[in-house]
Each structure stands twice: as C-alpha cells, then as structure tokens.
C-alpha cells in the first residue's frame, strides 16, 4: 500500500479588496471621503506532518502487509490478521493548534466504503474482492470511511494525540464480499488530507 500526505493550504481571496479599492477611486471623483478600516486575524494555517512505519520518504511511503515479501495467507485476511502498523506524526505546527482533522482519500470499494480497492487491473494474478482499511490502532475494528469529511467517519485527532504529536494507525487487508476474495497481487494508495484550526 502506498501512502501519501497532502496538505490543505488556505488562501485569502483578494478580489474583494480589489473591488473595494476600485469603488473607492470612483467615489473620490465626487469629493466624497470614505474611511475604511480593515480588521483581520492572521493565522498560521499549515503544519508539517510525516509518516512513520513504512519504507520511503517522510511524505510518501510504501507499507508492506504480511511477511517481508508482502505475502499474506487467505485465512489471515479473513481473520483480520493481515495488518501493518504506522503513524502520522506532527513535525511542526503552530502552538495555537486546537483541532486537526484528517480525511483518508482513495478509490473506495463498492462493497466496503471503509476500504480502498485494489488499484491493479483485474486479471490473472490480481486479487479481487480485496481492500485495505485504515483505523486507529486502539480502534482497529472501526476503520475510517474513505473520502468522508464527516467527523464521525474520519480521523479527528484527540487532544492527547495532538499533545503527543502522533496518532498510531493500522492498515488491514480485508475481504470486501463474503467468500469472494481471490488470491493475487494487491496494491492501493491512500492520501491523507489535513484540516487545521
């Protein structure tokens, strides 16, 4: 499974300021003075995050489920034993950080909304009816819904996780339809999108 991180950046729209400035110039021709006071709150909106537990860089990693060769027994998948642990770690965030929400994005399985489907084209040697789920290690049976921005369905960091600057996660290979899982290669990509307050 390849894991990416994506940072959301906020930008201040300047079109409103341009429109206000243009209307102010037009009014000046009529000898009318307008005083405009702008009030703004400037926030530091980005954090630096990294992944720990797989192979690769801090922001793009490959996580192997199974043995060193990525081999997993069919029974292990069906018994929820085909897993790999990893973490998202805060490297640097503003001291004012009070809320951190993470959406797990990818191509969801049509049978399992919490699973990211196999990205390999169906065919000989490719696993079918398989997906990978991502959950907290402390709540491994409650995976996040893929692409959901609803707080109840995505990773909302607790105060303790923010304070510890880390959230331990588990990726689990799952069967998406009972008695349908086929053996073969499996690859999936998850992207983590962050919202900060």
Predicted regions and their residues:
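Mature extracellular/passenger domains of Gram-negative fimbrial/pilin and adhesin proteins
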Residues: 2-10, 27-197
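Sec-dependent N-terminal signal peptides
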Residues: 11-17
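Generic structural signal for beta-strand residues in well-ordered domains
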Residues: 19-21
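N-terminal signal peptide c-region/cleavage motif recognized by signal peptidases
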Residues: 23-25
């Amino acid at each position: 499974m390849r894991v990416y991180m994506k940072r959301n950046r906020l930008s201040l729209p300047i079109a409103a300021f341009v429109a206000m400035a243009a209307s102010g110039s037009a009014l000046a021709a009529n000898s009318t003075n307008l005083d405009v006071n702008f009030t703004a709150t400037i926030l530091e909106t980005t954090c630096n995050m990294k992944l720990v537990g797989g192979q690769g860089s801090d922001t793009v990693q490959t996580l192997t489920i199974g043995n060193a060769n990525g081999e997993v027994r069919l029974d292990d998948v069906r018994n929820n034993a085909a897993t790999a642990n990893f973490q998202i770690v805060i490297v640097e965030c503003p001291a004012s950080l009070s809320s951190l929400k993470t959406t797990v994005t990818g191509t969801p399985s049509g049978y399992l909304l919490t699973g990211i489907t196999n990205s390999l084209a169906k065919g000989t040697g490719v696993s079918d009816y398989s997906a990978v789920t991502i959950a907290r290690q402390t709540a491994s049976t409650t995976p996040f819904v893929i692409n959901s921005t609803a707080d109840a369905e995505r990773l909302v960091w607790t105060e303790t996780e923010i304070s510890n600057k880390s959230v331990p996660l588990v990726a689990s290979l799952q069967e998406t339809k009972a008695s349908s899982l086929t053996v073969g290669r499996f690859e999936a990509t998850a992207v983590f999108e962050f919202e900060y307050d």
